[in-house]
């Protein structure tokens, strides 16, 4: 499809020992935009080197020196044309987990807003997950419908998806009751980010519906969750979307990579 753009998002699990294997697998997809999560500080230089050598320009979130491990998990955006970082795009409480940048795909009349997010876990202190999801949702909702934009990353939601499209969040028990200490605000924040603002679409569900059952995170005997997503704004059409489970099955991460192809909607071309 003319003007179509490949996007890859992957939580690389802060791995160092297998970084070169991870990079080989990322580069094999030849995506126009790459979004990575859990890039630790002492891995960033190697990731940057591998990506730049392959013709990408890289932008990465800032991680404070000496930060505890939970705050050492950064994110990066790589693209064939230099990403222009959008400062202060959303007031996230853990800023190292969020990065927004404008990327100019070849032949597109305007830049693509790329938001790369690694949401904190539900049990994080100070409602970090809820505040992060609310801030990102608000920033996306402020964009006009004609703005091509994507949200990529490990959103750490939902807990479960029914075949009728009903979501169960991590604010709920498996029986559907709200968990003590999480409540309705947590539930609303997860539900909102899982589908995006009005007109936004989950690329995977838009193409495969809710009949498709898949998991992007698995560890040991745990049945896993579908935590890794690409959401697209009304100005975009998802053309293809699938998970690369091979990277997880080969032990390169506890997450599968998501590979999507997007294009400008007819009304914006």
What name fits each language-model region?
Residues 1-54, 67-72, 266-269:
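N-terminal, active-site-proximal structural segment of metallo-dependent hydrolase catalytic domains
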Residues 132-227, 232:
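Metal-dependent phosphoesterases centered on the DNase I-like endonuclease/exonuclease/phosphatase
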Residues 248-269:
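Surface polyanion/phosphate-binding segment centered on an Asp-His-Pro turn
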Residues 39-120:
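Structured beta-strand-rich core segments of catalytic domains in phosphoester-bond hydrolases
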Residues 69-85, 104, 196-197, 221-238, ...:
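Conserved beta strand-loop-helix elements of the APE1-like EEP
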Residues 4-14, 110-121, 152:
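Active-site-proximal beta-strand elements of phosphoester/diester hydrolases
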Residues 13, 40, 118-120, 155-158, ...:
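Catalytic metal-binding/acid-base residues of hydrolase active sites
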Residues 87-89, 117-133, 176-179:
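Surface-exposed cleft-lining segments at the edges of enzyme active sites
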């Amino acid at each position: 499809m003319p003007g179509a753009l490949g996007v890859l998002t992957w939580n690389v699990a802060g791995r160092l020992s297998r970084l070169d294997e991870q990079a080989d697998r990322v580069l094999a997809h030849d995506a126009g935009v790459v979004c990575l999560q859990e890039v630790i500080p002492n891995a960033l230089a190697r990731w940057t080197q591998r990506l730049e050598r392959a013709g990408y320009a890289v932008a990465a979130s800032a991680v404070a020196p000496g930060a505890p491990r939970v705050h050492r998990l950064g994110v990066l955006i790589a693209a064939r044309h230099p990403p222009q970082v959008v400062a202060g795009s959303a007031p996230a409480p853990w800023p190292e987990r969020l990065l927004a940048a404008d990327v100019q795909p070849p032949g597109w009349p305007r830049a693509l807003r790329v938001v790369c997010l690694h949401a904190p876990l539900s049990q994080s202190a100070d409602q970090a997950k809820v505040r992060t999801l609310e801030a990102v949702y608000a920033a996306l909702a402020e964009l006009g419908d004609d703005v091509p934009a994507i949200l990529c990353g490990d959103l750490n939601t939902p807990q479960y998806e029914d075949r009728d499209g009903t979501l169960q969040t991590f604010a709920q028990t498996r029986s559907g009751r709200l968990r003590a200490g999480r409540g309705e605000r947590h539930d609303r924040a997860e539900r909102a980010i899982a589908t995006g603002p009005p007109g936004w679409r989950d690329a995977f569900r838009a193409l495969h519906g809710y009949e498709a059952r898949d998991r992007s995170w698995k560890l040991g005997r745990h049945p896993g969750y579908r935590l890794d997503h690409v959401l697209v704004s009304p100005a975009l059409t998802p053309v293809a979307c699938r998970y690369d489970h091979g990277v997880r099955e080969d032990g390169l991460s506890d997450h599968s990579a998501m590979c999507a192809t997007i294009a400008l909607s007819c009304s914006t071309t």
